[in-house]
């Protein structure tokens, strides 16, 4: 069973010089001009299989208890290495 979902969004805006800043001599009239554009897209493909452990091993390569042990080992190594 496989399903596929695709989503995309985009936004665009233009920023121009504020006339109050120019009239108060805070910035020069030709110094401010900017354009920004943002876009985002996401695709989700899901596949399920009950007989194969490989997808689980790819998604979660290290369990949390081994992650905690590795973090503690790194912290102890740092303390011993710096001589604290």
Swiss-Prot record:
Bilayer-crossing regions: 66-83
The entry's keywords: Endoplasmic reticulum, Glycoprotein, Membrane, Transmembrane, Transmembrane helix
Glycan-modified residues: 45
Domain of life: Eukaryota
Keyword Transmembrane: yes
Gene Ontology CC annotations of this record: cytoplasm; endoplasmic reticulum; endoplasmic reticulum membrane
Low complexity compositional bias, start-end: 34-54
Residue pairs linked by disulfide bridges in the UniProt entry: none
Cellular compartments annotated: Endoplasmic reticulum membrane
Membrane topology type: Single-pass membrane protein
Residues covered by region (Disordered): 34-57
Note: Present with 49500 molecules/cell in log phase SD medium.
Protein name, entry field: Uncharacterized endoplasmic reticulum membrane protein YMR122W-A
Species for this entry: Saccharomyces cerevisiae (strain ATCC 204508 / S288c) (Baker's yeast)
């Amino acid at each position: 069973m496989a399903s596929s979902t695709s989503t995309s969004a985009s936004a665009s805006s233009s920023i121009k010089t504020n006339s109050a800043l120019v009239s108060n001599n805070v910035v020069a009239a030709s110094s401010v001009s900017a354009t920004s554009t943002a876009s985002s897209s996401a695709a989700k493909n899901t596949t399920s299989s009950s007989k194969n452990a490989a997808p689980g091993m790819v998604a979660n390569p290290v369990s949390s208890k081994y992650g905690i042990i590795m973090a503690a080992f790194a912290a102890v190594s740092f303390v011993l290495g710096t001589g604290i």
